[in-house]
Amino acid sequence: MASQGTKRSYEQMETGGERQNATEIRASVGRMVSGIGRFYIQMCTELKLSDHEGRLIQNSITIERMVLSAFDERRNRYLEEHPSAGKDPKKTGGPIYRRRDGKWVRELILYDKEEIRRIWRQANNGEDATAGLTHLMIWHSNLNDATYQRTRALVRTGMDPRMCSLMQGSTLPRRSGAAGAAVKGVGTMVMELIRMIKRGINDRNFWRGENGRRTRIAYERMCNILKGKFQTAAQRAMMDQVRESRNPGNAEIEDLIFLARSALILRGSVAHKSCLPACVYGLAVASGYDFEREGYSLVGIDPFRLLQNSQVFSLIRPNENPAHKSQLVWMACHSAAFEDLRVSSFIRGTRVVPRGQLSTRGVQIASNENMEAIDSNTLELRSRYWAIRTRSGGNTNQQRASAGQISVQPTFSVQRNLPFERATIMAAFTGNTEGRTSDMRTEIIRMMESARPEDVSFQGRGVFELSDEKATNPIVPSFDMNNEG
């Protein structure tokens, strides 16, 4: 990556730290997840959850959402100023599932936000521990990425639904900071920028006055984040053009959509981290594991290790397949929603099936669903191997971006070819004559045309046995190249 010197590792972003050495990073990430674990244990005590109920992923999600809502200052302020009927701005809650007489029952709980904030701070040595909150946001975002394909949202902003693999982090809240920006896909950033430009077109005052100045700063910052994700000079130059535009309008929207399409082959660098549900950290802390002393990393073996030894349950609807539910959560845990299925299957050690073939709905259960027939199952979150999470997008040879499959944003740093249908992608570029023609466009199209699907990305990188924690012995899987992607 260019400008490597100015980049902080994700762990530093995650923990808000300045430059630290590896040991310090591991310790501060460890401190962050043990704080989440302690908070979860305390909440289980408050709610008098049994061991089984505390391991239920739906309960974990409710508790995580409560603390995120308790710390959402902007929304809290908004709720205070715009009171809506039947919503107490000072309270937060959600469904908690309990086991009664051999059945699962739903109980809606309500807590003071102040109380939740107190418990969270107490679990985090009296600090606000924003990093831990961001971590939970990213876990929810990864779960959404695995569960939903944002086709409707893409069409709404004038993008192509086939670009769904660029949409990582599209449900992350704005307040997720640098760690959140690192995991957002190219499509997500493009969509945020297009929404902003459209508002500017419809609302004359959007860029004007004191507020408009702040808007402009936000616009340029988002442009810079997106620029930093691109790995070729031409794409970056085009981003400069979008950023410097006096009065962003349709020409900029066209340029951004062009750039998003180009990212299907000249892929952006998007960070991946394994963020696990709070109950997993809670279980580990409860069993006496000292995260801060041992250190922890979101991109190495640690999350795999943790999942090897954690038993997490999930509620299952009558016609859902428990194995498919497990796959969904496994993908969410490793931020692998857009990974090549061959790679995921190899690491997991069981076949990972395409999203469309899963007979399972989302993890959360709607409040109007009948609990009578709902059962629970153990989620199978273990893996056969582990691999390092990547932030590069798969272009190991820096000089020219290597090819990318239409539906892949690599998660694991594992050698593979990135098969893609060049014809399909290039078809998206013909017949689009609006927008500016520029040397940059010509250059980008030329690079895309010269990309070869058989090029190998992540040369020499492999997966590792779970006993190989120092990653000394890479096993490079060989995929037969015509396998499903």
From Swiss-Prot:
Q: Where is this motif: Unconventional nuclear localization signal?
A: 1-18
Q: What's this protein's function?
A: Encapsidates the negative strand viral RNA, protecting it from nucleases. The encapsidated genomic RNA is termed the ribonucleoprotein (RNP) and serves as template for transcription and replication. The RNP needs to be localized in the host nucleus to start an infectious cycle, but is too large to diffuse through the nuclear pore complex. NP comprises at least 2 nuclear localization signals that are responsible for the active RNP import into the nucleus through cellular importin alpha/beta pathway.
Q: Key word Protease present in the record?
A: no
Name the UniProt record assigns to this protein: Nucleoprotein
Record keywords, A-Z: Capsid protein, Helical capsid protein, Host nucleus, Host-virus interaction, Ribonucleoprotein, RNA-binding, Viral nucleoprotein, Viral penetration into host nucleus, Virion, Virus entry into host cell
Q: Name one GO molecular function term.
A: structural molecule activity
**What Pfam families does the entry give?**
Flu_NP
PTM summary: Late in virus-infected cells, may be cleaved from a 56-kDa protein to a 53-kDa protein by a cellular caspase. This cleavage might be a marker for the onset of apoptosis in infected cells or have a specific function in virus host interaction.
Q: Which family does it belong to?
A: Belongs to the influenza viruses nucleoprotein family.
| Subcellular localization(s) per the UniProt record | Virion; Host nucleus
Q: Does the record carry RNA-binding as a key word? A: yes
Q: Which organism is it from?
A: Influenza A virus (strain A/Goose/Guangxi/345/2005 H5N1 genotype G)
Coarse class of the primary localization is virion
The annotated subunit structure for this chain is: Homomultimerizes to form the nucleocapsid. May bind host exportin-1/XPO1. Binds to viral genomic RNA. Protein-RNA contacts are mediated by a combination of electrostatic interactions between positively charged residues and the phosphate backbone and planar interactions between aromatic side chains and bases.
Q: What biological process terms from GO does the record include?
A: symbiont entry into host cell; viral penetration into host nucleus
Q: How is this protein annotated for GO cellular component?
A: helical viral capsid; host cell; host cell nucleus; ribonucleoprotein complex; viral nucleocapsid
As annotated in the record, motif Bipartite nuclear localization signal runs over 198-216
Q: Provide the residue span(s) of the region labelled Disordered.
A: 1-21
